[in-house]
Structure formats: structure tokens, C-alpha cells
Amino acid sequence: MKFTTLTFIVATFICTISCSSDKKVSMELPMINLAKDYSNEKKNIHEIADVEYIPLETTDESILRGGWVSMSNEYIVIKDKDICFFDRKTGKYLWKFNRTGNSSEEYPMFNYLAVDFRSEECYIYTPIGNKVYVYTYHGDFKRVFALEVGKEFRLSIINDYNQDFLIGYNGFSYRKDPTLLDSHPYYLISKKDGKVSPLPLTVKRPINKKVKPTGDDGYMDSSMIICEMINLLVNENEAFIGDFALDTLYTVQDYKLTPVAVQSPSVFSGDIPLVLSADLFTDTYMGFYAIKLDADNAWKSITEAPYLYWNRKTGEVHRYELYDSNILTEKVYNPWMHNTNLNRNYGVTRLRAEFLVEQYEAGNLQGELKEIASKMDMEDNYVLVLCKFK
């Protein structure tokens, strides 16, 4: 691995504990009890968040299947089969680009997108050649760099960290060959030249998407898939890391690695690993699943996992069933920020056009949603719901 000034920057990380000594901080941090049976509490999303509904304009050029979301004060960017730009306030479709191809200025495969709204650049990662392609907002090629790492390496997530670096996770840490397990799987990546350096966080027994122990400190493949729910989230200039194999949760801000909480019981305290899988991390709330990684009951492990909210300010944990008072029928949804680049304290969710039209015709909508749905067609794009947590 090549080390340049990036190594010096990473060396400035301050950690109040030895990052490989996960147990030392358990007595000093807030404890999140994953084993407790929390009772369901119905909660109106409007009580804990300011909610915006953005109907994304449907044109022949802007038909969306789903897609990951990035946003600034001006734009909403959807990474779907293309990279589509919409107006942040109105949802009006603006433009899109797709540079898939085989030339030196095109990417052969499109895995992950990180948008830098400061420099107005789009960073596209492809595992083919382990490269990051950099484009302008309109898809004009700027540069490409290969991630030169002296071991098995493939990013399973990449996101914007600050003006100089991206942050990513090495997906090869879940290979079943223990010799390929990456004990430092979280990386800063230079936006200038792609130089990489691991964060000083040691993960001795990575498990992530692999759940069945092999007896040699490695984990083998199983049918358990946690749908890319890797515990790396970014809340503006603060990154959250909650590796499945560690009891301690961390944040990374201003090149400082700080433990913020510890789960109980310990991940490996029982026969089946119990992990905290977060997809929301704001100044006040962390939203997460408490999942028993049971290889013999993989689907059940996911479908029966409770979704909980930890209040970072009070230390309380709640099992909220969030509903929207503008929808007069039961619909629970949990805003998320996984693989997104949002304004601070925002989570997102989607409301399908088909659902909204059906509820409108049944008289089950009110307020702004009723007005939006009255103008919609079944085939329209979804309404993006932006939730700014209080």
C-alpha cells in the first residue's frame, strides 16, 4: 500500500481508547440493550421530524425504479440506472448522465456514487480495476484513479467525507478465507489521487454479511444477506461506524475517532451473534435493527428483527412504530440514510405513486399529501419524503 501525506493525516486521529481493545470502554459509555423486549410505541413522524414531500417529476428521461439519494440545498441527485438531477425544492427534473462504456473516460460498471456538492463533482466507483471515475454534475470527465492496495480490496460502500477525502468500507472483509479478512476495513480515500489509508480501527473477527462460524475465527458464506446494510453512515461532516463484529460504536469527525456507545450483550456472548445494524444516525437519534445472525434461520432473522431508536441525548431506547398523520391508514416507515449524502440530520423514505393514488381515491390522505396525490398518476415517480430530525 502506498502511504503519502494521507498517512500523516490518518495518524492524527485521536482515539480516547485503544481501538482494538473494545471491552475497555464498556464501563464509560452509554449502554444500548439489544436483548430487552421493548414494547411498541406508535409515534407520529411529525413529532420528531420536520417532513417535506418532494414529488419527483416524471418525464420520458426521468423514470425511476428506486435509487440512492444525495441532496444539497439546490439539488436532489438519484443514482438509479442513470444519475438524475432534480430541483431540491420542487422536484422538477433537470438533467441526467450515464457514462457507461469501455473508453478511458467511461466506467465499465456502476456500483457506488458519492457526490461532492462543494466541488460539484460526482465520484463513481467500479470494482473492475478498482477505479474511481470523477465527473462534473453534467457528466463531463475530469479524472480517474485506481485504488492501489496491496491486498484483496473491493469497496462495498463509498461516501463523501469532507473536501479532501471519501470514506469507504472494504467489502472483502467478509470473504470466507480467513487470510483475506481485512482487520482494518474502513478507509479514507484521497479525492485528488486515490491514495488510501485505513482508519485506526481494528476488527479482529469481521462478520458482517457472513454469519456461520468456521471455527478458525473466520465466517463462511450463508444465505444471510443484510442488504448492504454496512454500518457506515455519514451525517454531514460526521461519519458513524458500528462494525457488526465490535461492541463499541464510533464516530469520525475532524479526523477524530470517538467511541459513542456500546451494545449489550456482547456480539459474541451467545451461540448466535447479536448485531446492531444502523441505517439512521442524526444528532438526536440512531435508528437500527437488533439482528440475531442465525444462519439456519436467515430470513426469520431479518423479518423478526425489531427496529429501535436510541435517543443520543437522553440515552433512552424506544421501539417506535412511526406513522404519518397525513396518511389515515396504518403505514409504518422508518426514514434511513444508508448510502446517501444528505443535509445534516436528514433521513429519507419514499411513497410510491400507486400507493398514494389508491389512498387518495379511498379518502385516506389529508394535508399536503392529499394535494400532491390528487395530481398524480399510477405510473409517476415516487414522492421523496425528506425528514429532518429534531
Give, region by region, the residue ranges found by the protein language model.
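Asp-box/WD-like beta-propeller blade repeats and closely related beta-sheet repeat scaffolds
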Residues: 127-184, 198-212
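Conserved blade-ending motifs and adjacent loop-strand segments that build the rim/top face
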Residues: 258-278, 312-344, 357
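Blade-loop segments of beta-propeller domains
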Residues: 57-61, 92-127, 149-150
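Beta-propeller blade signature
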Residues: 134-137, 181-194, 246-250, 301-315, ...
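Structural signature of eukaryotic scaffold interfaces centered on beta-propeller domains
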Residues: 66-71, 111-118, 156-163, 170-172, ...
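A short helix->beta-strand "capping" segment at the edge of beta-propeller domains
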Residues: 34-64
